[in-house]
From Swiss-Prot:
Residues 1-80, 173-200 are annotated as: Disordered. Pfam families: zf-C3HC4_2 (PF13923), zf-CCCH (PF00642). CDD domains: RING-HC_RNF113A_B. A zinc finger (C3H1-type) spans 131-159. Its main location: nucleus. It comes from Yarrowia lipolytica (strain CLIB 122 / E 150). One of its GO terms (molecular function) is zinc ion binding. One of its GO terms (cellular component) is U2-type spliceosomal complex. Residues 45-66 have a biased composition (Polar residues). InterPro entries: CWC24-like, Znf_CCCH, Znf_CCCH_sf, Znf_RING, Znf_RING/FYVE/PHD. This is Pre-mRNA-splicing factor CWC24.
Amino acid sequence: MFKRKKNAGQKRTTIIDSDSSSEGSGDESALSSAFKRRKNDTQKRTTPTSVATSTKVRAPSFSSTIDHSHSRNLSKTDEATKETILYAKDDSDDSQKLSKGPYKVPFSKPTTTTTVGLKASSNIKSTTSQDYQPDVCKDYKLTGFCGYGDSCKFLHMREDYKAGWQIEREWEIKNREDDPPRDAGGVSRDADTATSRADSGIPDTCPICQGEFKSPVVTQCCHYFCEKCFLAKHKKKQNCFVCGKNTNGVCKPFKR
């Protein structure tokens, strides 16, 4: 068995040696024509493939294309696109200025304006109330109606009541009125002297002018004088004319 050669179908190119130049030129022309024919054959073979690739259908692109070229030519007169306003530099800004000293330290210009708070509104009225009875329903007390009804957890009552501080204040006022007068040392007088003076009442005559009382006044030490006599005596000496205690010029009119 004979093996078939791999280059059995290929054409053989023979080179013929010749002595004359004429023969060489003829052979060269034959070789060049052979090579040209082979080159033309390759071009013919590759032409269908190139045509096929050129006529290949492309897939349509569904991506939307937006033209942004118009955004570059914005009008500089618009308020929103004014570059002069956006990038304007304040002439009064001295933060970039340097001091004239040897270290060239930036300094800030001291502010000459005084900062004040906001002005309060003149058309708003605010009221503040202190709740001393948090267990009483305020709606029911003021209006007699409560939106929660019987399920309200606060007490439904409309009676007048007094808070603890009101009771203590009335108690102090009552004790101040009933308390017997005290002398300059702050020591209360004996009950016997107070009751005896109350039983005896006002003396018949003024101890200064020895006459009847005209517009009587009483001092802190419970001595009675005429108003005119007391003021005249007070200009010279502030002590009581009867007991000698310092009255500090204080007296109050006596009402029978």
